[in-house]
A protein has these predicted regions:
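Hydrophobic residues in well-ordered beta-strands that form the structural core
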Residues: 72, 95, 120-122, 250
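N-terminal Rossmann-like dinucleotide-binding module
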Residues: 1-51
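Short, Asp-centered acidic motifs that coordinate Mg2+ and/or phosphate
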Residues: 35, 69, 146
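Beta-loop-alpha module in the N-terminal Rossmann-like domain of NAD(P)-dependent dehydrogenases
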Residues: 19, 51-110
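Rossmann-like dinucleotide-binding domain that binds NAD(P)(H)
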Residues: 162-226, 230-235, 304
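NAD(P)-dinucleotide binding in Rossmann-like oxidoreductases
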Residues: 206-208, 220-285
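C-terminal helix-rich "cap/oligomerization" subdomain common to oxidoreductases
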Residues: 1-4, 62, 69-71, 288-319
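A contiguous active-site-proximal alpha/beta segment in oxidoreductase catalytic domains
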Residues: 101-161
């Protein structure tokens, strides 16, 4: 039996805690968390509340030295320096999106990582989603003709993200296009092919706030794509649909559905709400992290795919 790979974590905020808990509770056969670093005062308290959590080390370098794979959930400006330090030390890296705050830096990093044959991937969980696997099976029986993506929020940031509102609510690094639409662009790239932005419109509030609405037309592998996003247009905390040919769709992250003969949407038999699906998805992601770290084939988002998504996101926001 293959031994679990050791995992170091930089950043123990919302995403870091979520992945750490998944590693401890659902993926012990794949990874063993061994070290954490986060300079925030609240991080030690957060870590102390997690049963079986590894110790907090004094520096990022100490975490890199202790692990086989470094998971990076720090603020985006730190992603590339941390990733390059880990790669230089012979570690694999698993990075939260986006790759960087600067597209120029992201492009240069991807070029260096590819040239070096680095073991590096980005955390787009749809790579391991059972609902997406169901969509893929249904899509195999279709000829893709059109895709419609819609996302909507009652407020931005979402309720559970308010602790990070200081930057998520701002135009410079935040907004729902970077945080949420990026996942559906990754899904589109995987399902249909290379992305091309044709036109986009963005609505910004006065001041430095993040976008309140977007519309865009794209193509994906030659298939026409429409994209809409808005704040204040739903009562759900988070509502989204990814609909292919008006016939199959992913709804609210985790419900694979297809159109019935009577015109109603029917869920896949094993459909689950996102909060119940998430542990399964993260377990799958961590199994893929272990495979990547061992140098095996994996399904994780490559740094090239993540860069392609970031290019489209930033082009939309600059429209």
């Amino acid at each position: 039996m293959t031994s679990p790979v050791t995992l170091g974590l930089i950043g123990i905020g919302i995403m870091g805690e979520r992945l750490l808990r998944a590693a401890l509770e659902h993926a012990s056969e794949s990874v063993t968390p061994v070290a954490v670093w986060d300079p925030a005062p609240a991080a030690a308290t957060r870590l102390a509340g997690i049963t079986g959590a590894p110790r907090m080390l004094a520096t990022p370098d100490a975490v890199i030295a202790a692990c086989d794979c470094l998971y990076i959930a720090a603020p985006p400006a730190a992603h590339i320096p941390l990733a390059e330090a880990a790669i230089a030390a012979g570690r694999s890296v698993f990075i939260e999106k986006p790759l960087a705050t600067s597209l120029t830096e992201a492009r240069a990093f991807v070029a260096r990582a590819e040239a070096a044959g680095a073991r590096a991937a980005v955390n787009f969980p749809m790579a391991s989603s059972p609902a997406v696997a169901q969509l893929s099976a249904w899509r195999a029986a279709l000829t893709p003709e059109s895709l419609a993506i819609e996302v909507a929020f009652p407020t931005w940031p979402r309720g559970w993200q308010q602790a990070a509102a200081s930057w998520l609510a701002k135009r410079a690094e935040g907004g729902f296009t970077r945080e949420v639409v990026s996942h559906f662009l990754f899904l589109t790239r995987r399902q249909l092919g290379p992305l091309k932005l044709l036109e986009a419109q963005v609505t910004y509030p006065p001041g430095d706030g993040a976008e309140s609405a977007i519309t865009a037309r794209l193509s994906a592998g030659g298939v026409p794509v429409t994209l809409k996003g808005s704040v204040g247009t739903t009562t759900k905390d988070d509502h989204n649909t990814w609909t292919l040919n008006g016939a199959i769709r992913l709804r609210d992250w985790s419900f694979a559905e297809r159109l019935s003969a009577d015109g109603t949407w029917a869920q896949a038999p094993d459909a689950l709400p996102n909060e119940k699906m998430r542990p399964m998805v993260l377990r799958g992601q961590l199994a893929e992290v272990a495979a990547m770290t061992r140098g095996e084939a994996h399904r994780l988002a490559t740094v090239r795919e993540a860069l392609e998504v970031q290019e489209i996101v930033e082009a939309i926001l600059a429209s």
